[in-house]
Amino acid sequence: IRVGAARALAQAGLGVAELDHIDLYSCFPAAVEMAADMIGLGHDDPRGLTLTGGLPYFGGPGNNYSMHAIAEVVGRCRSRPGSNGFVFANGGYLTKHSFGIYSTAPAQGWMRIDPAIDQIEIDAMTSPSFTEAPSGQGSIETFSVVHDRGLPAWAIVIGRLDDGRRFLSQMVDGLDALIDRPAIGRRIAVVAGHPVNRARWV
């Protein structure tokens, strides 16, 4: 997201501060927060992060939500000639990204940039190694508690072993401790399992 947004803004000759109308694809709050962080927008930016009210409230048939955001940003740019709009869309598991810059004032000297240049930077980024069969102690990176009939049933836990490897696991006991106080960074133990890895508090 960071690389793509920076490229789109650079090609338009604009900075984040020069954007007047902003819409970030809003399938889930995490998608909006991650995009804002990568683009350089505050979560409470006074310009707002949606032009429609957001996908959960505005809707949009099928995969068509961002078309409505584009239509809205075009209308706003036309009503304020010279203003600039930005629409970010994503798909997959936050793995496919689209960036659009809109204005009534065309960028001067615009030229296409080969996306392979940006792909080189993306390919050079480091990420933790992943293990499908974790064993040992580590810490929680993030989690989601699954509820059944209003009660916590189990949790998906993404963690990092002490050796740095990332893992995916399930937790079934001690779920209140995930909900009642901050859990990110807390210590857990994990054992490989079939069909799922199991995490527990230490």
Features from the language model and the residues they span:
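Short, well-ordered amphipathic alpha-helical segments that serve as non-catalytic structural scaffolds
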Residues: I1-A12, A69-V73
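Acidic, glycine-rich loop-and-beta core segments that form the ion-binding/anion-interacting portion
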Residues: I1-A6, S26, V32, M38
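Conserved catalytic cysteine-centered active-site region
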Residues: G4, M38-A69
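Secondary-structure transition/capping motifs at alpha-helix termini
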Residues: A10-A17, I39-G48, R76-P81, A107-G109
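Extended C-terminal subregions enriched in glycine
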Residues: A10-G15, D20-L24, F58-N64
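Beta-strand segments within the central parallel beta-sheet cores of soluble alpha/beta enzyme folds
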Residues: V16-L24, D45-G53, R80-N90
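Conserved beta-strand-centric core segments of catalytic alpha/beta enzyme folds
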Residues: A30-A31, F58-V202
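Flexible domain-boundary/linker segments
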Residues: A36-I39, A155
